[in-house]
Regions:
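Signal peptide-directed extracytoplasmic domains
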Residues: 93-130
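Pocket-flanking alpha-helical
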Residues: 54-55, 66-107, 177-179, 195-203
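Segments of small-molecule ligand-sensing domains
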Residues: 244-351
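Extracytoplasmic
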Residues: 30-34, 44, 60-62, 72-75, ...
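Extracytoplasmic small-molecule ligand-binding "clamshell" domains
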Residues: 33-38, 42-89, 239-241, 342-345
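Pocket-lining segment of extracytoplasmic ligand-binding domains
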Residues: 93, 103-104, 164-261
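Signal peptide processing junction and immediate N-terminal pro/mature segment
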Residues: 2-21
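Bilobed "Venus flytrap"/periplasmic-binding protein-like clamshell domains
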Residues: 34-57, 65, 121-178, 182
Length: 353
């Protein structure tokens, strides 16, 4: 459970910050307090998650989160590594392997670290009902979003891991769906966190559905089994749940040098993000936040030093939090049945105290 993995520190009231007296001072303060995060295409999950970061964490002149539209996880990694105006970005657990294959890059693991493992992005395959399983798409025309997107990389790798060779096409998702309707494509692929907005808004009629892609035992450990249910996509999943694959998303960060202005503002971001994480679990935020475990490690990745320091400082408080949870459970005459219900009741109890 996300919020039970660490206890969040109480906020310390800050002293008033004097207003800058010159235009140059104003610019310096704005740059020193603004953290940019590269997200994804409009309407996508990364775009919505980036907006949540801004809504929750923006705090006047102390911290501003500035979401930037991006192509997705594949291109985001290059943006984090090379663009001076990009501090953070949503990338995937298979992203470092993608960058290692680029012979132009050196020691990529030293430049891109992660702050937290977030959630899983599921493989979605939209195709006509005649396509019963992913194997039926062998040799067919399949769209993998725009070149450089997360779907372009992860989706292609997933198909290779599944042993299905296709004729890969790169077009944007709205165009791909229109091509699918017209018979110019055999399937449209999206690797994104469910529910995906452009998929939920797609009207399949009686022609299209989400194709199952069962998890094979031989697949890379970067990918995990997942499922898509009628609750996720009522129009596209009729009857049985669809088995599929998923890949993890992490909040990547440029590994800035300690003592720099960029490093110090990222320290403030980490403190705010971890310390106010409960706010991301509110009903108006994306449901994928509820999958997050802030303390989870990611194989092959190095955690950004300020994030690791924050977790280390709060380990003792985590023990205290467990004791507090025990006290809460003793107050419950009728204990909620599910983990999520327990956690939501616990949050209300703690806020009331």
């Amino acid at each position: 459970m996300a919020g039970l993995s660490v206890r969040h520190a109480e906020a310390t009231p800050a002293l008033p910050v004097p207003e800058p007296s010159t235009e140059a001072a104003l610019g310096e303060r704005m740059n020193a307090n603004t953290v940019s995060v590269i997200t994804g295409t409009p309407g996508g999950t990364y775009f919505r998650i980036g907006a949540d970061l801004a809504f929750v964490l923006n705090n006047g002149d102390k911290l501003r989160v500035l979401p930037i539209l991006g192509k997705g996880a594949g291109e985001n990694a290059y943006d984090i590594r090379f663009l001076k105006g990009v501090d953070l970005g949503f990338v995937r657990t298979d992203t470092l392997e993608q960058l290692r294959r680029d012979t132009r890059l050196r020691n990529i693991e030293q430049h891109i670290h992660f702050i937290a493992k977030l959630f899983n992005d599921e493989l979605h395959i939209i195709a006509p009902y005649a396509v019963k399983g992913v194997g039926d798409l062998a040799g067919k025309r399949v769209s993998f979003d725009v070149k450089g997107s997360g779907t372009d990389y992860s989706g292609r790798v997933m198909f290779r891991e599944l042993g299905v060779a296709v004729e890969a096409i790169n077009v944007d998702q709205p165009t791909a769906l229109e091509m699918l309707r017209n018979g110019d494509l055999d399937a449209v692929v999206s690797v994104a966190a469910k529910p995906v907005a452009f998929i939920t808004s797609f009207d399949p009629g009686d022609r299209f559905h989400l194709v199952p892609a069962p998890y094979p035992n031989t697949i890379s450990e970067a990918y995990v089994p997942a499922s898509l249910s009628p609750a996720d996509y009522p129009k596209l999943v009729r009857g049985d749940v669809r088995e599929t694959l998923a890949v993890g998303t992490v909040l990547g960060v440029y590994n800035s040098q300690k003592g720099t202005v960029r490093y110090e503002k990222l320290v403030r971001f980490v403190d705010a993000f971890f310390g106010q994480f409960d706010k991301f679990l509110a009903p108006q935020r994306h449901p994928k936040w509820r999958e997050v475990n802030l303390a989870a490690s990611v194989k092959g990745w190095t955690r950004f030093r300020p994030a690791q320091d924050w977790l280390d400082r709060h380990r003792e408080q985590d023990v205290a939090s467990q004791s507090e949870l025990d006290r809460f459970l003793l107050t419950q005459s009728a204990r909620p049945a599910g983990k999520e219900e327990v956690y939501q009741a616990y949050l209300k109890w703690r806020q009331a105290r």
